């Protein structure tokens, strides 16, 4: 967690790497979306990834310049290749050296699908899979189940080069 005070019922978790900032949270709905928008603004979110079925309109987010990407996959499961490839594309598009822009990402509870995608980003950045899980869990307790850990342990980076610097 960070020093920024949250108005959300379940506080968001900031995960930072050498190349990206991620804000993991649970799914908003149309009624509480304004609270989430305030939080997204605090963290300078430019891209928002929904890893679950939609529960709110994207229009208010798009109106303030946040690009919304739908990448749903099964609860408790691992992302299919198409989701991983889209996720990596977003990581590439959003990378800016020394940027304080953040990628917001959520699933229903913010404990499974969203943290798995963030772990993939950390692995793509050169982090060991189990270190990535531990790093995320330090910031978002209870995240990533055993099945997802197994997937991450076996995950192979999509980068062309095997030489990586964290």
Swiss-Prot record:
Propeptide: 164-166
GO molecular function term, any single one: protein tyrosine phosphatase activity
CDD domains: PTP-IVa (cd14500)
GO cellular component: cytoplasm; membrane; nucleus
Residue ranges of coiled coil: none
EC number of the protein: 3.1.3.48
List of residues binding substrate: 113
Keyword list, A-Z: Disulfide bond, Hydrolase, Lipoprotein, Membrane, Methylation, Prenylation, Protein phosphatase
Domain Tyrosine-protein phosphatase: 10-164
Entry binding sites for phosphate: 108-113
Subcellular location: Membrane
Lipidated residues (S-farnesyl cysteine): 163
PROSITE patterns, alphabetized: TYR_PHOSPHATASE_2 (PS50056), TYR_PHOSPHATASE_DUAL (PS50054)
Record-listed Cysteine methyl ester modification sites: 163
Membrane topology: Lipid-anchor
SS bond list: 52-107
Major location (coarse): membrane
Catalytic activity: O-phospho-L-tyrosyl-[protein] + H2O = L-tyrosyl-[protein] + phosphate
Active site: 75, 107
Family: Belongs to the protein-tyrosine phosphatase family.
Protein name in the entry: Probable protein tyrosine phosphatase type IVA A
Organism: Dictyostelium discoideum (Social amoeba)
């Amino acid at each position: 967690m960070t020093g920024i005070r949250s108005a959300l019922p379940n506080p968001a978790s900031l995960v930072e790497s050498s190349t990206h900032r991620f804000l993991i949270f649970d799914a908003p709905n149309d009624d509480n979306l304004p609270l989430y928008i305030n939080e997204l603004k605090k963290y300078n979110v430019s891209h928002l990834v929904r890893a679950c079925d939609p529960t709110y309109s994207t229009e208010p987010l798009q109106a303030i310049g946040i690009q919304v990407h739908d990448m749903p996959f099964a609860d408790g499961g691992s992302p299919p290749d198409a989701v991983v490839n889209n996720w990596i594309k977003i990581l590439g598009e959003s990378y800016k050296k020394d940027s304080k822009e953040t990628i917001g990402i959520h699933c229903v509870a913010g404990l499974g699908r969203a943290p798995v995608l963030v772990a993939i980003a950390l692995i793509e950045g050169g982090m060991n899979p189990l270190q990535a899980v531990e790093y995320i869990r330090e910031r978002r307790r209870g995240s990533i189940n055993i099945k997802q850990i197994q997937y991450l342990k076996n995950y192979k980076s999509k980068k062309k080069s095997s030489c990586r610097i964290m």
